[in-house]
């Protein structure tokens, strides 16, 4: 195949897709460039299904190569290792809009790999990578109802910006990624600075309109390439078996879905299917496979739940479509933590803990474009017991990393600036029960735990998950969805924000045909639910604590002359090491002279501050100091009046009367008051006890130690 290349202007960038030159043994391969950011995306599919396979094994791996930015990895081995959080999140971003477009019953393994080969600091590779995945899938011939397009939308000076640069995003009130087909939006991921529902919906619509040129370009590329489609057909439906299973299970399933408690309902449904499987197998050696029964069973469960809701009946747990589950809140639940909250909504519960730290505790990130640190971290954990199951416990899975990032996005807009609250903040959400919307429970609990820790947030933030059931022209938007409603529904729509507006939005749609009107209904219904939750949160904890926990570090910030930094650090770090050990503090000094002292006790912090001020203080001629006699000489004594500031007390300046022997009046280690008479060009000091005795003793502010 000869190389084929297509280019368009996309926003203020040139978007190019090439195929036919690199990775020709992959089933589909494209090089996508957006200005100087270049991504190679490949697709390979297995033409045979593994025996007993009952799910679609799609894998998406996004990889950032350090050479793409002209860097060598900072690890010991000097090569790329386990995927970073950014790589995992981008892999999920690509996966979410393409997964719904594979046909039902397609269980062949498919792997998408996106490798960043060249990285422009101003252009994130996630949009080119998503576009590349769409193009490579179309070229592969694998059954896929695409192509899709993707766009990033910013909001600057009340105008939408298509594919803003990194610099533009720094002043944008919105960072939204949208992906979809020619007809429908499939995925939205965003963080915002308390924007209205209308602005957010407008951004989604704007991005979807703009991406149509990308979809057209991919279609043109496929036409020129001459794609050979796979010879795959879905399995024929066994209508007699479907009818038989429906007769055996439908009535009992309807009764089971009226059970409000998740564990009881799950057990009842499991028993129904075990009975059905046994009856279908009775008297036959072959009979239908368990996989076939599961597929028919899922469709039957979906039909029962969906039709019940569309017919105006109560939801699974007896609620109406707009009702939020009962909420209970406790804060300050853990005595030794810096802040904690227990947020329970129905059968979903999150125990959220905040820990405050210093600049040294900030997360150091080795990214493509250089190292940087983040003062706010949010980690989400969901152990298997949260759903009444057994399972692996260990490093976080992709889902946990994605949910943590969503909750973090929701809270970023209300965090206090570092000048106002100088702590590093780590929030950990331990999901102890899960029946839908655990990430949004983490948002609510995270907000309360931060306020319990004394973080002065700009406003309360609450999150809520919305669902959708759509059949033809009939649809129902569901507030605060359950796990089963998420599983059997058509949309998972998570919205977080304050009373003023939205701070984070995530939408995943499983079907095509979601209109702007439906999204508008969902957003307005989500606002109604969000405000309800915010009212309950405010009643529980109206404002942040006045002070941080007694177990949290105390932070003192001040500035010194940058030229004096070396005096505080000392030779080989000796001075600052002694300061931290003797005062029990942690001391950080920036190049601009900013000093941050963290200590468990106020006394230790103030002592460290006082000693640093003494070290960096300039000696003033005519001022009286308390000094320590360091050494006796025949003609006087060497006296230290400030750390590193020694002067000569001549024998004639010790007393008004004649002094025959210095030792008769002074001894080493003695504390005396002296006045600075003179400081020469070389910094040598001439001191006097006689002059000091005629004036008032120095106060602590005047240098007393």
UniProtKB/Swiss-Prot annotation:
Q: Which InterPro entries match?
A: ExoRNase_PH_dom1, ExoRNase_PH_dom2, ExoRNase_PH_dom2_sf, KH_dom, KH_dom_type_1, KH_dom_type_1_sf, NA-bd_OB-fold, PNPase
| EC number, UniProt record | 2.7.7.8
Domain of life (superkingdom): Bacteria
Detail which positions bind Mg(2+).
Answer: 486, 492
GO MF, one example: polyribonucleotide nucleotidyltransferase activity
Compartments where found: Cytoplasm
UniProt-listed Pfam families: KH_1, PNPase, RNase_PH, RNase_PH_C, S1
Task: Indicate the enzyme's highest-level EC class.
Answer: transferase
Record key words, sorted: Cytoplasm, Magnesium, Metal-binding, Nucleotidyltransferase, RNA-binding, Transferase
- Any one annotated GO CC term: cytosol
Reaction it catalyzes: RNA(n+1) + phosphate = RNA(n) + a ribonucleoside 5'-diphosphate
Gene3D superfamilies, from UniProt? Answer: GHMP Kinase, N-terminal domain, K Homology domain, type 1, Nucleic acid-binding proteins
User: Where is it mainly found?
Assistant: cytoplasm
Q: Which residues form the KH domain?
A: 553-612
**UniProt similarity note:** Belongs to the polyribonucleotide nucleotidyltransferase family.
Question: Which function does this protein serve?
Answer: Involved in mRNA degradation. Catalyzes the phosphorolysis of single-stranded polyribonucleotides processively in the 3'- to 5'-direction.
Q: What is this protein called?
A: Polyribonucleotide nucleotidyltransferase
What is the organism of origin for this protein? Nitrosomonas eutropha (strain DSM 101675 / C91 / Nm57)
Lineage summary:
Bacteria, Pseudomonadati, Pseudomonadota, Betaproteobacteria, Nitrosomonadales
Protein's gene: pnp
């Amino acid at each position: 195949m000869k190389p084929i290349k297509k280019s368009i202007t996309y926003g203020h960038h040139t978007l190019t897709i090439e195929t036919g030159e690199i990775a020709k043994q992959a089933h589909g391969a494209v090089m996508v460039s957006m200005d100087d950011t270049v991504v190679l995306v490949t697709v390979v599919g297995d033409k045979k299904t593994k025996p007993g396979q009952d799910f679609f094994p799609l894998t998406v791996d996004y990889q950032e190569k350090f050479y793409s930015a002209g860097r060598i990895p900072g690890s010991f081995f000097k090569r790329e290792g386990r995927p970073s959080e950014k790589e995992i999140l981008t892999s999920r971003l690509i996966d979410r809009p393409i997964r719904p477009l594979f046909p039902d019953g397609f269980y062949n393994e498919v792997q998408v790999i996106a490798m960043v080969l060249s990285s422009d600091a101003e252009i994130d590779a996630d949009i080119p990578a998503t576009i590349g995945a769409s193009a490579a899938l179309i070229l592969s011939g694998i059954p896929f109802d695409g192509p899709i397009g993707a766009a990033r939308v910013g909001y600057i000076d009340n105008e939408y910006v298509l594919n803003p640069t990194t610099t533009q995003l720094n002043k944008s009130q919105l960072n939204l990624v949208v992906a979809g087909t020619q007809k429908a939006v499939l995925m939205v991921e965003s963080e915002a600075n308390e924007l209205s529902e209308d602005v957010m919906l407008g951004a989604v619509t704007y991005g979807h309109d703009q991406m149509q040129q990308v979809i057209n370009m991919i279609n043109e590329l496929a036409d020129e390439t001459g794609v050979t489609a796979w010879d795959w057909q879905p399995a024929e439906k066994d209508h007699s078996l479907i009818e038989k299973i429906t007769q055996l299970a439908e009535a009992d399933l309807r009764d089971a879905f009226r059970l409000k408690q998740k564990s009881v309902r799950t057990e009842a449904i499991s028993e129904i299917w075990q009975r059905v499987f046994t009856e279908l197998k009775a008297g036959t050696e072959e009979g239908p496979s368990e996989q076939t029964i599961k597929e028919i069973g899922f469709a039957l469960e979906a039909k029962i739940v969906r039709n019940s809701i569309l017919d105006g009946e109560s939801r699974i747990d007896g609620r109406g479509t707009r009702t939020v589950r009962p909420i209970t809140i406790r804060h300050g639940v853990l005595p030794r933590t810096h802040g904690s909250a227990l947020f329970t909504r129905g059968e979903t519960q999150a125990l959220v803990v905040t820990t405050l730290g210093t600049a040294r505790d900030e997360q150091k990130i080795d990214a493509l474009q250089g190292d940087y640190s983040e003062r706010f971290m949010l980690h989400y954990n969901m152990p298997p017991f949260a759903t009444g199951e057994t399972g692996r416990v260990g490093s976080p899975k992709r889902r946990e990393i994605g949910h943590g990032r969503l909750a973090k996005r929701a809270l970023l807009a209300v965090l206090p600036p570092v000048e106002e609250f100088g702590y590093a903040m780590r929030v950990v959400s331990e999901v102890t029960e899960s029946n839908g919307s655990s990430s949004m429970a983490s948002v609510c609990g995270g907000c309360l735990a931060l306020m319990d820790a004394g973080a002065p947030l700009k406003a309360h933030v609450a999150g809520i998950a919305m669902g959708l059931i759509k059949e033809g022209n009939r649809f129902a938007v569901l507030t605060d969805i359950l796990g089963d409603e998420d599983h059997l529904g058509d949309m998972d729509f998570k919205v977080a924000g304050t009373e003023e507006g939205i701070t984070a939005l995530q939408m995943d749609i499983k079907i095509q045909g979601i209109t702007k009107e439906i999204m508008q209904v969902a957003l307005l219904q989500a606002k109604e639910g969000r405000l309800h939750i915010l009212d309950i949160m405010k009643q529980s904890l109206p404002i942040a604590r006045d002070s941080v926990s007694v177990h949290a570090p105390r932070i003192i910030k001040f500035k010194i002359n940058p030229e004096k930094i070396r005096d505080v650090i000392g030779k080989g770090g000796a001075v600052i090491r002694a300061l931290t050990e003797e005062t029990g503090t942690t001391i950080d000094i920036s190049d601009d002279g900013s000093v941050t002292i963290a200590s468990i006790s106020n006394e230790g912090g103030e002592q460290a501050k006082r000693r640093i001020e003494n070290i960096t203080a300039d000696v003033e001629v005519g001022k009286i100091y308390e000094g320590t006699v360091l050494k006796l000489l025949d003609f006087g004594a060497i006296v230290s009046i400030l750390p590193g500031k020694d002067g000569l007390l001549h024998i004639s300046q010790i007393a008004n009367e004649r002094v025959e022997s210095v030792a008769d009046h002074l001894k080493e280690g003695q504390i005396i008051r002296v006045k600075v008479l003179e400081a020469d060009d070389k910094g040598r000091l001439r001191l006097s006890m006689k002059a000091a005795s005629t004036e008032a003793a120095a106060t602590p502010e005047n240098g007393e130690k």
